[in-house]
Every structure is written in structure tokens, then in C-alpha cells.
Amino acid sequence: MNQPYSAMRNNIHMLGDFLGETIREAQGNEILELIESIRVLSRDSRAGDEKAREQLLDKLANISTENVLPVARAFSQFLNLTNIAEQYQTISRHHQDESLGNRSLSALFARLKAQGTPVETVIKTVEKLSIELVLTAHPTEVTRRSLVHKHVEINKCLGQLEHDDLTEAEQTKLKRRLMQLIALAWHTNEIRAARPTPVDEAKWGMAIIENSLWKAVPDFCRELNFQLEKHFDVQYEVALSPVRFSSWMGGDRDGNPFVTAEITQKVLRMNRWKAAELFLNDVSDLVEELSIVQCTPEFREKYGDHIEPYRVVVKGLRSKLQKTLTYFGELIEAKPTTVDPSEIITCDNDLWEPLYDCYQSLHACGMRIIANGSLLDCLRRIRCFGLGLSRLDIRQESSRHETAIAEITRYIGLGDYAQWTEDDKQAFLVRELSSRRPLVPTNWTPSPETQEILDTCKVVAQQPEGTISAYVISMAREASDVLAVHLLLKEAGCNYTLPVAPLFETLDDLDHSEKVMTDLFNIGWYRGVINNYQMVMIGYSDSAKDAGMLAASWAQYRAQEALVNLAEKYHIELVLFHGRGGTVGRGGAPAHAALLSQPPRSLKSGLRVTEQGEMIRFKLGLPAVAVETLNLYASAILEANLLPPPEPKQKWRDIMDKGAAISCEIYRGVVRGEPDFVPYFRSATPEQELGKLPLGSRPSKRNPNGGVESLRAIPWIFAWMQNRLMLPAWLGAGAALRQMIEQGEESTLKEMCNEWPFFSTRIGMLEMVFSKADLWLAEHYDQRLVAKELHRLGKTLRAQLSADIQTVLTLAHDGQLMADLPWIAESIALRNVYTDPLNLLQVELLQRLRSQGEVRDPQLEQALMITITGIAAGMRNTG
């Protein structure tokens, strides 16, 4: 193995030793020996030793109730430490150049230069670069914030230990600190006592910005500037902002009754308070720093004749920011405000303009090196975060808006809007949108549900333009769904046009999306207000749950392609908003590969994508890791726009059309058509028990009594990942490919693998899933937990998985899974030794708990929750 990976293994080994010492001290030798014996048996079992496997099963079947908790915690915490070591590896000083390889900005710019791409073309494309990451608190971030903080500190220690010039005393001190942190993590409860509230989730998002992104964004801009200067001898313009952040935390009310208008208002104020605090820190540093005397005559004329002109300007800003902080602090705590609102900073430009004037004056006076220090970082942050910290999306389901408008039309004697035809709805909405008189009578008292919708629209209307980034309509099916939101916002007094983004998320809705947008673009009123800008959101998780991975991904591709062509026809700037998750069943794929597999021209207006739950922590949780993530996103977007992927050949499309139809039929045949499927799913996975895990603020079901279709996409995937069958990520895909091969299409499929990024990414994602799936463990869940009469279904599914693995191997490079990403294969193999005991222990705990009926042993329940979070850490994907 090469040197960087041996360094990573050494780190994992060291962290594991420290964890062992912690356990010995806390629990005693006997427990440590039990844990070690389980680890050795698991390792031997993985290597094919049948006797070791039997001994492992026997040991875990007979484990005492008091021992289940420390054993589950030991393996779970070890997997967390492995994740930390792996995350550190990507930013290690010894590994930096290899980490991004040919996917980095540097490699892309070198390639563009070698190919003779005109500098003007590169600059123009870079100037339009737009990466908007939308942070969402999906109920998959299973690690508590108090543990995350300790994990960040462990990462810092690993970085300090890498320095070659440490004295023995310094090394000992750092190792002792590592042991302290691991001991602190061991003595901290992994599982929250209660579900987080939407406000807790918003605070978690703010903590990511404060602790990581605040530093990462200016660092990334410096990296971008450095690479532009190095390869093309140009500077990146200060006023440009390649990165923006938005959030769903406190704005996403789809299926979450706890996110109310009041909560949204509170989160918006908390964001402003936190932004004021962070900018106050920046500006206070500038007060210390900018003691310079010399400035331009223009600067002196604008800001007065002072000995230290810059200091006077930044002191004025400091005073205003202090008042802004106090003002929003009082609003959040519902105290009477002691600050005059005219004395606070409310718009970004009030902060930007004086600081940019300082920047230009310093430049003009030959002090470029000073201008390009912390002042430049502060300017970059104003452009990226602004005084709202992160913009907020509002999301609500289309039927809620329809119900609200129907209530209004019934009250004013126009009949029931919900019963009208689509044409009648559109005619009514356009008429009302074009009218100056209000629709809602002032003396009317709506139902509480409708009042909540109207109150939310009022909160949106009260915000300065730009604070709310979009109003997303989930389950959007028709043009009237979009017009309805525009009407509700108009009624609330919103005097600017907010981007209203329909979210197309089922197979039928994706196929219908072009028609919906055509209807909208043909409405004169609509074209007049959108200012040639349209955002459309593509749903990945629900479409995959509806139709299976292959059919969903092809429908997403076709919908994006059709929407890009439509927008070009109408000369409208289209931003596609991708609702991806971290898992394959929810559209997840390595960022760079996923972006290059998009249809040509679909990234012309930049990228807007959700970053969800645990992926936020893996990709953005540390400043250096966040810089890498932004580097990958930037290079992929620029590459997609400057070196676009090929248009798929007609024969490739025909194969995808056929394959998608076959795979959808197979997937739905099992998930919808198999009468025993739901009882099998409920018994073979910890789906019922997952509902007890205090993960997110949102209920896991849309309808508590429904079947699979009422289950949210996230717990659906989380449950299958636990028993290692990983069903949603592959069902239907491999079988469809097998049928194509049997029909003589093998050489075309291999051509698609080699020449079409969309298809090769799909095969790569299947390889990843198959590397993590485990037939023996999935069978073990069935044997112990599933009624005999349902065993046939599990047997059929495992046979299908086994056949699918062989099919993908036929198409994969070198005939082995993950051959082109050996370090991921290595990582999965390393984790399996620690994840397997958690799976086996989970089966044991599920069986014991289910046999106890209603009154369950709290110790066993706690241990079960830890196996769930541990397996999630081991798989590096939750939902």
C-alpha cells in the first residue's frame, strides 16, 4: 500500500489503541478482552474462516444484557474514529496533491491551457461561476453536536502530530490530548435525549457556518485566485461571489408541522444576529489592523480628514454592528428593543461600500499586500454570506396552497377552486394576479391551516429582497401550483418577485415537467414578472423510491435536458436545483462525477444543490475539507461548461428508454406488486424501531397508517442500509442490464460505460452499493427476524442481488468492483470488520426486544440505537 494510506492506517491504529485504553479504564479488562475477541473473530470470519463465523455468532447470541451496551459503543465509536482519520487523510499535508488528482481546479486549468482554450473564454466562464449549497437538516445526521465538536478537535490533533519538527514533549502532549478527547467522547451519550426542534437544527447549520465555512469561503477564493494567476495571469474580481449558502432549516415545512411562520421568523432573526456577531469580530480585527495614515484624496473627501482614516471608517461600522447585534438579540428574546432601527445595518451594501472603498484606496496607494489580507477576506464574506448569514428557502406541499385558495373561493362565493379544471384554475389565478384589488376580505377568519399558510407568506413579504432565496413547491404537478404561490405572496403584500420553484419528484411528474413549464412560459403575466429567470427543482429521493434507481435517474436526465432546451427556446435563464441525498437511492454520487454526468448545458447558470444531514459534516465540517469540496464543485462546473460531455447517441437513448422501463416494472413489481413486501420489509429491517431514534424534527411518515408509499424516502433507505441488503439502490437496475446483455447489447453497454459520463456514473454507483451490501448478513437478518412464510421473498431478493453483482462485473473495469477507486474498496474492507459485529448484535437486539412485547428493556433499546448509528457510520451513508 502506498505511503499516504499507510499513514492513515497508522492513525486509525493509534486512535483504536487510545479507545482501547479508555475502555479498559472505564469498563475494566474483562470487557476490553470481550471486545477484542469479537474483533478478531470478525476479522477471521471476513477472511472466510467458517469456524470463526460460528464462534462469533455464538458469542453475540449469548452476550449478557449488561455487556451489549459497551460492546455496541466500542464498535460504533471505533467507526467514528475511522471516519475522522479518513476525513483527515483528504487534507493531510502528505496527501494534498493526490487527494483531488485530476479533478482539481489546478489540473483543469492546466488541461484548458494545454488545449489552447482562449483566456477570455475561461475568464468569462469563471466570472459566471455560481455554486449555491443549500444546507438541509435531514433526519440522518445521527451524530450529536457535542460529539461532533470533539471529533473536530481530534482532527486538529492529527494535523499537529503530522509536523516533523515536534519535540518528544510536544508529541506526548498532543497524544495525551487525543486520549482526553477520546475519553470525553466515550463518556458522552451518543444518542440525543429528545428530537431536535427546528430551531436546534438551524443552530446546527449556523455552527457549520461559524466553525468551518466562515474560514473556508475566503480560503477557497484565494485558491481560485492563485490558480487563475498561475495558469492565466489574471486576478479573480473582488466583487464576484462564486459561492452562496442557503438553508432549509427553519424554512422547510413540507410534512413538518413544527416549522411554523413564527419559527421561520425566529430563525431569520437568529441568522441576522449570528451574521452581525461574525462580522463584528471581523471588523474589530480590522480596527486593530488598519492603523495606516495614507489614503487617496477621494477617500478623504468622502469620509473626512482624519489622521487614521481607515480606522475611523471601520470604527463606525463596529459601532453599528454592535447595535445590530443588540437589536436582533432583543427581538429573538421578545424583549422591548432599546436600539433605534435606523442605527443598525440592514443591507449588505451598507457594510460592503465603506470596506470596498478602504480596499480600493489601499490598492491605489501601493498597499496591495495589506488590502489583500483580512480586509479582502471580509469583503468575500459579505458577498457570500451577507447580513442574513445564509438565505432561507421556504418549502411547502402544493396541496396546502390549493386548500387555502379553495377556502378563499368558497368564502367569497366563487365555488370550490379544488374542483375546477386546470384551465379554469389558471384563468382565475392570472386574472387575480393581474388585478390590483385584494382577493382576501379583511374581516375573514380562515381555518388554522390556511392561516398558517397566509402567515408564512406574510413573513416572506416582510423580509428584505434576497433574504429568502426561493419558495419551493413539493409535489408540483401543474402550472396552477406555481401561480397559486405567486397569488398568495401577492395577497401577503410581497412587493418583489420571489423565485418560485416547482419540485418535480415522482416519475410521472418528471415526465410531465416540460409541459408544466411550457404552460407557464406561455402565460404573458408570468413571463412579465419572472424577469427571464426560472428555478426548477429536481427531486432525486422520491423519484427513486417511486420507480427505482435506474428509471428515476434516466427520468431526471431527460427532464433536465427538456427543461434546458425549453429555457433556451424562450431565452430564459434556468437554474436547476438538485435535491440529492448522500446515498445512491437518493441521487448521491461523488460530487465531481455526478456533475459531469449531467446533461450538456444544464450547469450553464451554475449549480444549486442540497447538502444533507451527515454529508454536510463529511464534506463541509472542517475548513480544509470544505475548501476541497468547493474546489471539486468549481472544477466540475467549469469543466462541464468549458469541455461539455457528449450528447448521448440515439442508440444509447434507446437502450436507456428500454432499460428504464424494464427496471421500473421489476422494481414496482416487488415494492408495489408483492403482497408480502411490506410485512417482510418491516420485519427484516429495523424500520419500526427507527421511528424511535430522535434524529430530526420531522416525522418519518407522511401518513402514520400507510405502507411504503407513505414512508419518507430517507427512513426507507436508512432501514435497508441497516440490514445490508441496500435494496432501493439497486432493485431493477441490474436485472434490466442483464436483459439488455441477453438481447445482444453488451458491446453497446460497454461503449456507454467508456464514453458517456451519465452511464458510467450509474455503473460506478452500483459498484459502490454492491461493495457495501452483504448477502450473508442480509440472510442472517431473515433467518432470525422474519416469519418462515416470508423467507421465500428474502431468498428471491438475495438471488437477484447476487445475479446483479455478476451483471455489473461483466461491465466493470477489470471485472472487479471498485477497481478504479481502490482506496474506497480498501476503506470498505477495513470497516466491515467493525460493522459486521454491529449488524450481528443488531439482529440479536431486535429479536430480544420484539419478543418482549410492549414493555421493553431500556438498556437493550439504547444498545439498539447505538448499533443503528454505528452501522450508519460504518456505511458512511445514512439516508
Curated annotation (Swiss-Prot):
GO terms for molecular function: magnesium ion binding; phosphoenolpyruvate carboxylase activity. It catalyses: oxaloacetate + phosphate = phosphoenolpyruvate + hydrogencarbonate. One of its GO terms (cellular component) is cytosol. This is Phosphoenolpyruvate carboxylase. GO terms for biological process: carbon fixation; oxaloacetate metabolic process; tricarboxylic acid cycle. It is an enzyme of class 4 (lyase). PROSITE patterns: PEPCASE_1 (PS00781), PEPCASE_2 (PS00393). Transmembrane segments: none annotated. Its cofactor is Mg(2+). Forms oxaloacetate, a four-carbon dicarboxylic acid source for the tricarboxylic acid cycle.
